[in-house]
Amino acid sequence: MDIFLRSISGILVILGMILVGFVIGEKGWFDDKSRGLLAKLVTQVALPCYMLYTITQRFTAADLLKMLPALRFPALSMVILLGIATGVARIFAVRQDRRGLFISMFFNSNTIFVGLPINQALFGDASIPYVLIYYMCNTTFFWTLGTYLIQRDGEGEAQFDLKTSLKKVFSPPLMGFLLGLVMVMLQIKLPAFLASDLQYLGNLTTPLSMIFIGLSVSHVGVKQLVLGKDQLLILLGRFLVAPLLMASIVYWLPLPSLMKQVFIIQSAMPVMTNAPVVARLYGADSDYAAVMVTETTLATMVVIPFLMLLMA
């Protein structure tokens, strides 16, 4: 019960910040352009600083070398989820013009905008390396296979562009993580003033991310949130199939309990915030993607405490 109450407390912290974003969104403080600016501040400024500061200040080379082989667990989970999603889309006759988007949302999760703050709230900073390991896998899958599938919905015969995909995979947050990794391995220390700058900027990550989520919920509108077949299947995939699959992969293995818990929580995160953006770019069903981002984000706040209780 103590774990359940602690997880409820962590979720309430997150919900409070989301509520702030929702309220100012309803008041019309942010238009599409300013929402995009907020997302850029998080992904291109706050998150890279957060990654670089956290890795260089809190981990040793030995710590990181022990963790990197764990990449195989989220990778295996996502490959299996991709197969399951493809089968589910065919069995339940998901519309052809949104099938690729459906598959992408089924097997990819929002590991940074939502995953990082939630894991921090539940487990503290010790969870960050495991969060980043899952993120590395997730972002690679989304900007390669996921984007290809969404593009196929909008353009029919999609073409895979390796150069564009690599630019997306090696995003500023991942580059911040990799730079931190190199500095730790080479035992390069940050000057104190620079470390402080990175810490201040990095601390913007969680509040700005949650305010952005609240703004997104306001933008979609509560009236748009419906539970049709295609919506329910995504909810089941994100919050039942994905965590059960990850749990079945890691449960029996001699891994740190924190790693297992973080991987399971990360697998049960909502649909990626980038999904509607990519869908709009390629002429796919961006409204469906936006609704699913909102519905799964709200559902996460209910699901996570019960997941924590089960893992205890």
Task: Please give the residue ranges for each predicted region.
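Alpha-helical transmembrane segments of multi-pass small-molecule/ion transporters
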Residues: 1-312
